[in-house]
Amino acid sequence: MILGITPARGGSKRLPRKNIKPLCGKPLLAWTIEAAKASKRLDRYVVSTEDAEIAAVARQWGAEVLDRPAALAGDETTMLSVIQDVLARLPAEIVVLLQATSPIRDEGLIDRCIERFLATQPDSLASGFICKLTPYGSGPRQLRCQDVAGFFCDDGNVYVVQAELIRRGDWVGARIEQVILDRAQNVDVDDAFDFWVAERLMEQRQQCRAGS
């Protein structure tokens, strides 16, 4: 079974109640729920939350809700422990993590990531981008951006992981597959500025669709 999971706790600090904050006419969480529901590859999809209001919003937008223990909703709670809690209660061979804080996904992105995972059989797959930033003064001279090879950074949009790996307490594994996305999909809402960026990008996408 391929299980999609969106963790959505209620206690976000830098941007309070961000998971249900309205973004271009819908709660932030709803954008991810809609993308998950459009997937043809997910066998089951759940939202994990301890928060009654978030649970109600998730159900309103058509998601199945799995009640999360309050002990797994604190600031120090790891994503791994949240996913392990879900796997302790639901069967799965493959886990697809879809974070509510990444609302911008091209149509079909989730299924393309799952299909890449099935074709290559890695331990884990992550979407992201190539970062070419270097610390100032870190070398004998400052390289031009085009001369820097860069390194892969995950962006929080889509993760696909072998469920057994997670059960063993690992999230990444040894064999990793990368899916490079255009920068407009790399949004990960953590604070008010991130939310503002997400709004502008989403508005632009909606205008492009309306004009097409």
Label each region the model flagged:
Residues 1-16:
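N-terminal nucleotide-binding beta1-loop-alpha1 segment
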Residues 28-45, 52, 56:
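A short, N-terminal amphipathic alpha-helix
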Residues 42, 92, 121-123:
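Short, high-confidence coil segments that cap the C-terminus of an alpha-helix
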Residues 45-49, 127-128:
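Short internal beta-strands
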Residues 46, 52-96, 104-112:
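Short phosphate-binding loop-to-helix
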Residues 76-81, 103-185:
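Conserved core of the sugar-phosphate nucleotidyltransferase
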Residues 179-180, 186-212:
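Hydrophobic helical membrane-anchoring modules
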